[in-house]
From Swiss-Prot:
Gene3D superfamilies: 1.20.1270.20, 3.40.50.2030. It catalyses: A + NH4(+) + H2O = hydroxylamine + AH2 + H(+). This is Hydroxylamine reductase. It is found in: Cytoplasm. The modification Cysteine persulfide is found at residue 408. Hybrid [4Fe-2O-2S] cluster binds at residues 252, 276, 320, 408, 436, 461, 495, 497. Keywords: 2Fe-2S, Cytoplasm, Iron, Iron-sulfur, Metal-binding, Oxidoreductase.
């Protein structure tokens, strides 16, 4: 086992990364090894997908499968060995299918089929024992003694960034958004990473390419969500419990939420969002369901307590899931799509009757809590609509600075930095937030500036796209570069989606971003220095010191 993809990975003087019997996330060594083998098989599929494309062969089904299966290897997504093995076996079948199509096309064209690298040649074992025996060939740091640590760090930056992009591709696909060119670029990068490079410049360029690719993917996801559900609008949301039977929907998949709402109409069941599903409450399409009553709980790391206290059924539509046995709710939590936990019921297809039956059998909330509301829904359209008023307030001096504070949440004590930062921002500044990092301060009162709320909840982590659009619009109005705006970006990271959002911002030339609370363990000191010199990227320090720098206070 070797896994170093998330913030909570083991860090010791002897080396970084989870490499024992179990990772800090709860992932067993066997699961980690099977995930590495799955990635290896997917890279082999991409090798043939690239070659097939050169001869005009495009398989949309395979284009969708590869990022979806890759998504299953993200932090806190799938801990079920059987499901991971099934993905690997399907990858082997697709690779064989593409190989046959490619070789037939070569024969028809009268050309010789090209040799493929080792990553596209492995004959996958048929049992778990055989697959685990093959896993060392796919170990991410298998050549660590022969490769400089900076090269290893760049490889992992690319791999983990592409994982984040794969997740957004799958979210977009669920909403009907696919693009053959995007899929082609994805396969090219997967294929490249399947042949471990020692070219630092090429790896760095690839990291930026992943950022650019993800920008296109975020635009696709934005289109998918707004075409399906309308543009989010400022919305007041209750965050307390409501009497009645209950279902809690966590993750990121709004299509699943829509299906659950449709299937619970007239059933006497209240539906709550959780975590990154909170932004769904701002979409017009969901407002026609009166039994979508609010948001319950906070960010992913608190789920073992929050789900244990929730008196209904829980559905995990995507990341992040953690051990449901700790809170003794494994018999009433359900997984969807790429999510998996051993022993937890997995919902195939679009029939949520098992979830509904479980909710009806449980007690539900026995009384209404006194409501506590927050305002959400300041995504792209709402931000652009407010842009003229924002511009006028900037020109008048009422608004002097913008902060984007968001990203992933986590359970480290030093994440209180983001709470204190938000509370310490000047009263003449606006705070944009997104991702589950918002839960560090989204229930606090920040007031407004001439009717414009100081705290603007942009949405999910992928809605960084909305914030980027606002920054571009403001830069155009003020005839300046984005980096010349009075804008400070402070991103909390935990896993691979945050990594690819960061790569997206860097690829767009955005500078002076702060990340925290700790730097990724796979980034060496040399790489961190290069990123600081090239982009001004730096780690958070103290709220007082960082604010002085961001506000140019002597």
């Amino acid at each position: 086992m070797f896994c170093i993809q998330c913030e909570q990975t083991i860090r010791t003087p002897a080396g970084n990364g989870c490499s024992y019997s179990q990772g800090m996330c709860g992932k067993l060594a066997a699961t980690s090894d099977l995930q590495d083998l799955l990635i290896y098989m997917l890279q082999g599929v991409s090798v043939y997908a690239v070659k097939a494309r050169e001869l005009g062969i495009i398989d949309a089904e395979i284009d969708s499968f590869v990022p979806k299966a890759f998504f299953s290897t993200l932090t806190n997504v799938n801990f079920d060995d059987e499901r991971i093995m099934a993905y690997a076996q399907q990858a082997a079948k697709y690779r064989t299918q593409l190989k046959a199509s490619y070789e037939a096309a070569c024969e028809q064209a009268g050309i010789v089929a090209e040799q493929v690298p080792q990553v596209a040649q492995l004959v996958l074992g048929t049992s778990k024992i055989e697959m685990l025996a093959q896993a060392p060939i796919a170990l991410l740091n298998k050549d660590k003694h022969n490769v400089h640590e900076d090269i290893m760090g760049l490889r992992l930056l690319c791999l983990y960034g592409l994982k984040g992009a794969a997740a957004y591709m799958e979210h977009a696909r669920v909403l009907g958004q696919t693009d053959a060119d995007v899929a082609g670029s994805f396969h090219e990068i997967m294929s490249f990473l399947g042949e471990p490079s020692v070219d630092g410049d090429k790896l760095f360029t690839t990291a930026m390419d992943i950022g650019q690719l993800n920008y296109r993917i975020m635009a696709m996801l934005d289109a998918g969500e707004t075409q399906a559900f309308g543009h989010p609008e400022p919305t007041v949301v209750n965050t307390k419990s409501v009497k009645g039977k209950a279902i809690l929907v966590s993750g990121h998949d709004m299509k699943d939420l829509e299906l659950i709402l449709e299937q619970t109409v007239g059933k006497g069941i209240n539906v709550f969002t959780h975590g990154e599903m909170l932004p769904a409450l701002a979409y017009p399409a969901f407002k026609k369901y009166p039994h979508l009553v609010g948001n319950y709980g906070s960010a992913w790391q608190n789920q073992q307590q929050e789900f244990a206290n929730f008196p209904g059924a829980v559905v995990m539509t995507s990341n992040c899931i953690i051990d449901p046995n700790v809170g003794s709710y494994s018999d009433r939590i359900f997984t969807r799509s790429i999510v998996g936990w051993p022993g937890v019921v997995h919902i195939e297809g679009d029939d949520f009757s098992a979830v509904i039956d479980k909710a009806l059998a449980l007690e539900g909330f026995i009384y209404d809590e006194i409501p506590h509301t927050i305002t959400i829904g300041f995504a792209r359209n709402a931000l652009m609509a407010a842009a003229p008023a924002v511009v006028e307030n900037v020109k008048s001096g009422a608004i002097k600075h913008f902060f984007l504070v968001g990203g992933c949440d986590g359970d480290k004590a030093d994440r209180s930095y983001f709470t204190e930062l938000a509370k310490s921002t000047p009263k003449d500044s606006l705070i944009l937030t997104l991702g589950c990092g918002k839960y560090k301060f989204n229930k606090l009162e920040f007031g407004d500036i001439n009717g414009i709320p100081r705290l603007l909840d942009v949405g999910q982590c992928n809605d960084a796209y909305s914030a980027i659009q606002l920054a571009i619009a403001l830069a155009e109005v003020f005839e300046c570069d984005i980096n010349e705006l009075p804008l400070s970006l402070v991103l909390s990271w935990f896993e691979q989606k945050a990594i690819v959002v960061l790569l997206t911002l860097l690829s767009l030339g955005v500078k002076n971003i702060r990340t925290g609370p700790t730097p990724p363990a796979f980034l060496t000191a040399n790489l961190a220095k290069i990123l600081e010199e090239k982009f001004g990227l730096r780690n958070t320090t103290t709220v007082e010191a960082d604010l002085k720098t961001m506000l140019n206070v002597a």
